[in-house]
A protein has these predicted regions:
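Sequence/fold signature of self-assembling virion shell proteins
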Residues: 2-38, 43-46, 53, 136-355
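Extracellular Cys-Trp
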Residues: 124, 128-133
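Solvent-exposed, polar/charged alpha-helical surfaces in well-ordered, non-transmembrane soluble domains
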Residues: 113, 117, 189-192
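Extended, non-catalytic structural segments that build the interaction scaffolds
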Residues: 63-65, 98-102, 287, 297, ...
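An N-terminal, globular interaction/scaffold subdomain
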Residues: 27-95, 99, 108-112
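Short amphipathic alpha-helical segments
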Residues: 107, 111, 183-186
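Sec-exported extracytoplasmic/periplasmic mature domains
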Residues: 116-124
Length: 355
């Protein structure tokens, strides 16, 4: 299923909303590269959503001769439940700052933009790295890495263990010093396996998430194998450049709120003290063994991986001068959750040697 088929994404909501404040917030989230722009959103007023998925428990089909009766078959899907998580923030500005005629810009608008920028950094990080194992934020959704890692254990999120794919390290070395035709082809084979693992061999409906170094290195690999153009590029409805591998959209989730640390680690520096990336086992690290990175693949759609929201899009309310008489307040909140409806929705390719 293609991204957003039959559902509204954040981008659609920004285009259709007739509330200037909501439109501004939605567009800001898109401009800052929030991953929520990719996720098809279903509106459902519930804090918990229930679903079922088939995890190898399909019915056995009966074949019979003429004049024989049919055989009753029954499928027993696996039930699951996800919960909504709340993003709730106030933007408070003193009334005298609001009334100051010497202000160059709208102070409340500037503060709101700063909050939205911070929100994007935080959402992007949590979408990939948040965990409920004591190391992350229990008030935010479980991220892709933890969902995929859990497949080999409790498998609470319906992900096949095979969807955590080892690229092979030195076998598919795409560092500038180690690249060769054989290794480049080995890497592309594993990248195609990543697409296959999320149910779309040609990449339709898929978003590939990688950091900026990995994106440049992918172009480098394609050119080194004799292709002239590298990755394909087109424009979206906001006239932004969209890069694709086959039909899969490529996105870089960027950096954390410190505006330095990459969300998907890997700085392509050869093994040494300057390396900041992942180990061959896919663990974030620094130093001599941290010259690897990962690529995440997500099949977005209501049959695969999607989200639900309590109301249509983010709630933006100008609460005006609150009852203390000195503060103008703007409320920005949103109740959202993530749902995995298929065992072939999300996957990770790790142990990619880029340094």
């Amino acid at each position: 299923m293609a991204i957003g088929s039959g559902t509204f994404t954040l981008a659609d909501y920004a285009l259709y909303s007739n509330q200037p404040a909501v439109q501004a917030v939605s567009m800001s989230l898109i401009d800052y590269g929030n991953v929520l722009q990719d996720i098809p959103m279903v509106t459902k007023q519930t804090l918990q959503a229930n679903g079922v998925r088939f995890e190898g428990n399909l019915p056995v089909i009966n074949w019979s001769p003429l004049n024989a009766e049919g055989v009753t078959v029954h499928a027993q899907p696996t039930p699951y439940q996800e919960q909504a998580y709340l993003m709730r923030n106030y933007v408070d500005v003193d009334k005298y700052i609001v009334l100051d005629q010497n202000a160059i810009t709208d102070t409340r608008a500037s503060q709101a933009k700063a909050v939205l920028k911070a929100l994007t950094y935080d959402v992007n990080f949590k979408f990939f790295k948040n965990a409920h194992d004591g190391t992350g934020d229990p008030n935010a959704p479980v991220g892709l890495r933890a969902r995929i890692d859990d497949a080999a254990g409790a498998n609470k999120f319906g992900v096949r263990p095979e969807n955590k794919i080892d690229c092979g390290g030195a076998t598919a070395d795409i560092s500038q010093a180690g690249i060769s035709a054989a290794k480049g082809n080995a890497f592309l084979e594993m990248l195609d396996l990543l697409l296959w693992s999320v149910g779309s061999q040609d990449g339709t409906g898929i978003v590939l998430y990688m950091n900026d170094y990995m994106k440049r290195r992918l172009n480098f690999v394609l050119r080194s194998l004799g292709t002239t153009g590298g990755l394909d590029e087109s424009k979206d409805q906001f006239n932004r450049t969209i890069t694709t591998y086959k039909n899969a959209v490529i996105r870089d989730p960027g950096v954390k709120a410190d505006q330095t640390t990459r969300i998907i680690a890997g700085n392509a520096i050869p093994a040494g003290s300057g390396s900041v990336g992942e180990t061959a086992a896919g663990v974030d690290s620094t130093g001599a063994s941290a010259n690897f990175t990962s690529i995440y693949a997500v099949n977005f759609g209501t049959d695969y991986f999607f989200g639900w929201q309590f109301t249509d899009g983010p709630n933006v309310q100008d609460l005006g001068l609150i009852n203390n008489g000195v503060i103008y307040r703007t409320l920005i909140d949103w109740a959202v959750g993530l749902m995995n409806n298929n065992t072939r929705s999300i996957a990770r390719l790790f142990d990619i040697k880029i340094g």
